[in-house]
């Protein structure tokens, strides 16, 4: 939560008043920091392939806790110094939290399941959705108790003690590394560590996936990768921007802070059953259908966010945001290993996560820029519809690609 936008947005006004930066300047720092972290996530994905999710997730947890402690002691700064400090702070926060810890956790789950991967990742994401939905209101309560500094310090302690313990206790690299086959179908000859006293030729080389799995370069040249990635990158960008400016957006619409942050809870209630449904669907058909559904939901969601002050607008925005969010898990956790395999899962998922994080970096700054020009956020919401429209066309192209491949495979038989 601390590295996600929902965990940052409630601290925005405190950061503005403490550092002396304007809202646009803080958004620019968020853009620079988050964009930089997105560029580094490709290396993070390769590190997961090399060292495993357990090591990377624990390192990310410690890094996130250290970042929160550092941010908790900031004070008034000149504009140039403030921009540099907050860019570094946001970069570390987003790289360790939203980026590396999330990527390592998703990959760990995806490595362990095949037959019901979509459903398992959906259940995991449903729990995370409720946590993220509840976090803004809970963090506001924590801030009200003793200020934003203490809130961040408490979260840093909880990360090391609670999350760190969970990672050490439960995270494992892959079924192959644990000496079993995926889905628990049987045993293999591959142990966690080589047996003492065995010679080099006797040691089995750990192989994950199959020789048919796509490399990162092959995936990036495949239209299906972009059909699966652009919808989640678009939602990351726009949803991050909305969440980052949620208090200011509420003021524009005549809503109080408490009224505007309450929309996240019904969004979670909508997204959870759809998350489970799309996970079930992904286990049975191509995830490109889920990508198409996500783009259609976004095309309705974005303009209706600007109508949250009306009853029908609020209902439409909550339903479509929940629907789009409900497709997220299927495309980020289950779709990549299903389409491209597990051998280079870290590298390919890292590329997808990079696009998402870079999108989430651009969104808040873009919305702040449009707001400074037009005096409101509605124009930014309408302009944000361009990416989902492009993604819809790519999804259709991806379906044609799959159909062509099926016909070719049938002809070979």
Residue ranges, per PLM feature:
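C-terminal transmembrane helical hairpin of 12-TM major facilitator-type secondary transporters
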Residues: 239, 255, 259, 264-335
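Symmetry-related core transmembrane helices of the 12-TM Major Facilitator Superfamily/SLC fold
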Residues: 152-169, 380-397
């Amino acid at each position: 939560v601390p590295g996600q936008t929902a965990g940052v947005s409630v601290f925005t006004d405190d950061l503005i008043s403490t550092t002396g930066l304007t809202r646009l300047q803080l958004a620019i720092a968020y853009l620079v920091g988050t964009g930089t972290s997105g560029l580094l996530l490709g290396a993070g994905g390769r590190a997961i392939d090399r060292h495993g999710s357990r090591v990377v997730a624990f390192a990310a947890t410690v890094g996130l806790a250290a970042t929160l402690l550092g941010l908790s002691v900031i004070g008034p700064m000149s504009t140039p110094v403030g921009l540099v400090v907050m860019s570094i702070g946001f970069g570390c926060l987003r790289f360790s939290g939203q980026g590396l810890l999330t990527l390592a956790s998703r990959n760990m789950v995806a490595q362990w399941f095949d037959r019901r991967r979509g459903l398992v990742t959906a259940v995991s994401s449903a729990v995370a959705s409720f946590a993220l939905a509840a976090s803004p209101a809970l963090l506001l309560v924590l801030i009200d108790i003793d200020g934003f500094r203490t809130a961040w310090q408490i979260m840093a302690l909880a990360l090391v003690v609670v999350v760190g313990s969970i990672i050490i206790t439960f995270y494992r690299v892959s079924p192959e590394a644990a000496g079993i086959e995926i889905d628990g179908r049987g045993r293999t000859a591959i142990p966690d560590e080589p047996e003492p006293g065995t010679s080099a030729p006797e040691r089995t080389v750990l192989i994950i996936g199959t020789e048919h799995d796509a490399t990162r370069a092959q995936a990036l040249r495949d239209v299906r990768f972009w059909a699966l990635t652009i919808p989640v990158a678009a939602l990351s960008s726009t949803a991050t921007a909305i969440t980052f400016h949620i208090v200011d957006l509420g003021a524009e619409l005549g809503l109080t802070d408490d009224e505007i942050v309450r929309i996240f809870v019904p969004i979670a209630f909508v997204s959870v059953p759809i998350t489970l449904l799309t996970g079930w669907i992904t286990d049975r058909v191509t995830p490109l259908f889920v990508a198409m559904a996500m783009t259609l939901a976004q095309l309705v969601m974005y303009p209706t966010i600007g109508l949250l002050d009306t009853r029908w607008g609020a209902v439409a925005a909550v339903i479509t945001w929940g629907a789009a969010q409900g497709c997220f898990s299927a495309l980020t956790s289950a779709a990549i290993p299903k389409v491209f395999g597990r051998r280079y899962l870290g590298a390919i998922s890292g590329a997808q996560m990079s696009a998402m994080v870079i999108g989430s970096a651009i969104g808040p700054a873009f919305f702040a820029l449009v707001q400074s020009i037009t005096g409101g956020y509605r124009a930014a919401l309408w302009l944000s519809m361009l990416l989902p429209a492009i993604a819809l066309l790519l999804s259709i192209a991806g379906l044609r690609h799959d159909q062509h491949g099926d016909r070719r495979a049938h002809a070979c038989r």
